[in-house]
Amino acid sequence: MMLPADFFVPVSKMMLLALLLSIIICCGGAQRSEPMFTAVTDTVLPQDYDSNPTQLNYGVAITDVDNDGDFEVVVAGYNGPNLVLKYIKEKGHLVNIAVDERSSPYYALRDRQGNAIGVAACDIDGDGREEIYFLNTNNAFSGIATYSDKLFTFRNGRWEDLFSDEVNLRRGVANRFSGRSVACIDRKGSGRYSFYIANYANGNVGPHALIELDETASNLSRGIIVLSNVAAELGLNKYTGGRGIAVGPIVNSAASDIFCDNENGPNFLFQNKGDGTFVDIASSTGVDDVYQHGRGVALADFNRDGKVDIVYGNWNGPHRLFLQMNTNGKVRFRDIATQKFSMPSPIRTVIAADFDNDQELEVFFNNIAYRGPSANRMFRVGRREHADPFMEELNPGDASEPDGRGTGGAVTDFDGDGMLDLILSHGESMAQPLSVFKGKQGLKNNWLRVIPRTKFGAFARGAKVVLYTKKSGAHLRIIDGGSGYLCEMEPVAHFGLGKDEASSLEVTWPDGKIFTRSVAEGEINSVLDIAYPHEDDTVTKPTDIECGQGFSVNENGRCTDTDECIQFPFVCPREKPVCINTYGGYKCRPNRRCSRGFEPNEDGTACVAQVAYFGSYPSSASRSQALFLHCTASLLGLGFYFQIYTL
């Protein structure tokens, strides 16, 4: 029997609305409408010959250049001077203090002759003040450059280049190869850092380098700082198209590891063996990504399981978000990037931070307008209970810069309002000034900023900070030692709290030293400076610490995961008797048996292939396929409706 056409008319609008809404929800095609950033360049850093010239800029690093306790923004100038931007609170402006005056203590930092591309800062000699490394690439894409790198230290009341010292000239230690990124690592946990340089080799010319203090040959009391390149003896002198670097306790609990994403070759994941030597485990852990060309990279714990994950961009290739897993004692990484997240782009910098202080991390992709506009993109990566994190594309607002020739970027809170500020540099194919952006979302959310120090009082780059909260479990940050690609973020563990409260924090230094302390209610929305602990400081009374939900204090006064599965009465219901302890929680599932190579799914209703067993890691394909089928069903439903409606 054919129904009359007017039968469908009363419900047509509602059905159409429902079907369209279903398609929008399942396909997730739109960005959030609220812009995340607003440009403040015109007021904070107006275009200016001295402080914001229109020139080719590259890397951006955050450090305390003038030793006054506030951060400065250091910018690598390629066809112009390097810049050191200081925030003047009274004026609300960023001003370049590396002025063109030879009497200035910062004059040498300008290094007008160098074509600087990468920049990083850390304390190489243990004087409590960070040195600044500029990686120059004069007249060379790869291989040998015509001008060496610069390594500046503050000595004799001014910044001076250590590579120009006679003793270091005789040693020929200055890097003269064309490189890209530079990062800092305290490989032995001594509090003194080495600079790791990702050079871009031309055949067997231009290996990676690791430059550090030669303690036996130096006389620090007389200002004699002797340097050595120890990459060869550590097996780090690799020949490849070096691009991005990230440093921190990636697979170790404390000692700093090194991740390098490369071009025209596999990535490296150098695991620190605990004595300052390394072994490459990229292939065995699944992050070698042989056929892609890496750029920006950052470290974070996206699913809040206490393990460090790796996110990076590939040049016009699929971007990656590798979650760290531990299966039968073996470390593996699994790419969970969704189709939208992994969408290829001419990527440069990648930044992971909580820009709106809502407790969820955002990932910012800074692109370069390459053969046409290429807007920057941004995703919220949020934790889901017993599932992979969700990825929600956000609207970057003014920071989208579709015509920006993005080459670098960094985050810091230069005005002290608890919201991270974003500084982007541009260049390469077109001279453009710097851009500065402030966050617009989450202005009323709580926050906490933690700055660990080395035993010498410098910033403890590579340290791990875990913040325990009353309602949302543990949040992990790594103090940045150089990442993003050519850049280095602020040496701060920045935590957005939303409406939650912090209960305690734990800092782990690269030497394995651990310090735990409670966080008072009055310390929320403030900056905590954490000194390197003396022996007496590491002893914490358990009664002083509150860990929050899912964690409890052990006999050493540290917060550890509570194993709910051994508690009485039993936490799981009878229909799901299998209890699995997770970091900060637990999950229950039915007692389902599976064949070898398979395991129960999350609900225990079916057997699915074990990712680690088959030695592969699912990309977005499986999720994209499910999403595609769901969307297709909705579209078919819509088509069916229109077909009936027209009958």
Swiss-Prot record:
PROSITE patterns: EGF_CA
Keyword Hydrolase: no
A molecular function GO annotation: calcium ion binding
Compartments it resides in: Secreted, Extracellular space, Extracellular matrix
Any GO CC annotation of this UniProt entry: extracellular region
Pfam entry (one): UnbV_ASPIC
InterPro entries: Crtac1 (IPR027039), EGF-like_Ca-bd_dom (IPR001881), EGF_Ca-bd_CS (IPR018097), FG-GAP (IPR013517), Integrin_alpha_N (IPR028994), NOTCH1_EGF-like (IPR049883), UnbV_ASPIC (IPR011519)
Positions annotated as FG-GAP repeat: 48-90, 107-149, 285-335, 397-439
Main location: secreted
Keyword set, alphabetical order: Disulfide bond, EGF-like domain, Extracellular matrix, Repeat, Secreted, Signal
Disulfide cysteine pairs (residue numbers): 565-579, 572-588, 594-607
Domain EGF-like: 561-607
Signal peptide interval: 1-30
Identification of the protein by name: Cartilage acidic protein 1
Lineage per the UniProt record: Eukaryota, Metazoa, Chordata, Craniata, Vertebrata
